[in-house]
Design a protein with these regions (language model features):
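A detector of repeated loop/turn-to-beta-strand junctions in beta-rich toroidal repeat architectures
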Residues: 15, 55, 115-118, 159, ...
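A short loop-to-beta-strand structural motif that recurs across blades of beta-propeller domains
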Residues: 17-19, 57-59, 119-122, 161-163, ...
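Short loop/turn segments immediately following beta-strands, especially the blade-tip
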Residues: 164-172, 254-261
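Short, conserved, GDST-rich strand-edge loop motifs in beta-rich repeat architectures
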Residues: 95-116, 254
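A short beta-strand motif characteristic of beta-propeller blades
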Residues: 25-31, 68-75, 129-135, 175-183, ...
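Beta-rich, blade/repeat-based domains predominating
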Residues: 1-8, 33-52, 57, 75-93, ...
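Beta-propeller domains
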Residues: 4-32
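Short loop/turn segments immediately following the C-termini of beta-strands
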Residues: 13, 53, 98-99, 157, ...
Length: 262
């Protein structure tokens, strides 16, 4: 992502590090250890909000640089391993919670014990309540809102599909339906996902980035060498699309800008 001050941030999950790249400076460690940080985004106050895989929490970087846990349990039980994350304009934080992080090297003892019998989508309300939002998922991963936030998109790595949900005024969702099923035999799975300002959905998948319109029709693919893991728009005009793979970061310019995160 391209936050203020022209920095690009990305996570190295196995390396347990959040990195930053700044023009004229280059690559630097931002946070280490990072609780094997996975997905991250910014809230409307410009604070970095992070899905902590090994910490099994959602945490935030305050303006003074301190790290604060904002969600850690649902009904008294630890989350599995928060995967990806998005913030709604009212301040609600939504994230996917799958069990992949329970096998990260270096996790020991109680941290390996799964306490929830579901892999789901949760949200933290502006009032600080954790709400179960989508529970009929197999392995939820990427998620994003449509530009007007009327639809929440959630993909499922195991099933290889993207679902769409209507968002109610209170932040709950309804009317879940399959938007698109990813196809292909090349490297890549349903993982990171974002929307552009015209409502098209960009999702990692076999061979790179699959682009669908709001009706689920495939309108194009962006070929990426290697296994694409996540993506984010950045730069001042939000027309630069950054894509991570297991070992590299790629950048391309797009005709349609992405949805800003602040």
């Amino acid at each position: 992502m391209g936050p203020p001050n022209s920095r690009f941030l990305w996570t190295d999950i196995i390396g347990d590090t959040i990195w930053q790249w700044t023009p004229g400076v280059g690559k630097q460690v931002l946070i280490h250890p990072s609780s094997h940080a996975n997905g991250m985004t910014f809230d409307r106050d410009g604070r970095l909000v992070v899905a902590g895989w090994s910490a099994r929490t959602i945490w935030r970087v305050e303006k003074d640089g301190s790290l604060v846990t904002i969600a850690s349990r649902y009904q008294g039980k630890k989350f599995n391993s928060p995967n990806d994350i998005v913030v709604r304009s009212d301040g609600s934080v939504y994230w996917t919670d799958s069990a992949g992080g329970l096998v990260i090297p270096g996790m020991v003892g109680e941290d390996l014990q799964r306490q929830l019998d579901i892999q789901a989508v949760f949200r933290l309300t502006p009032q600080g309540e954790v709400k179960l939002t989508v529970e009929d998922t197999v392995y939820p991963n990427g998620l994003c809102f449509s530009p007007d936030e009327s639809i929440l998109y959630v993909n499922d790595t195991r099933l290889g599909l993207i679902r769409a949900f209507d968002v109610n005024a209170d932040g709950s969702v309804c009317n879940g339906r399959v938007l698109h099923t990813l196809t292909g035999t090349e490297a890549g799975v349903a993982d990171g996902m974002k929307c552009d300002q015209e409502g098209n959905v960009y999702c990692t998948g076999p061979g790179g980035i699959h682009v669908m319109d709001a009706n689920g029709a495939l309108i194009g693919r962006l070929r990426i060498p290697g296994h694409a893991t996540n993506l984010a728009w950045g730069d001042d005009d939000w027309r630069s699309l950054y894509v991570t793979t297991y070992h590299f970061v790629f950048r391309t310019r797009t005709k349609i800008p992405g949805v800003p995160v602040w």
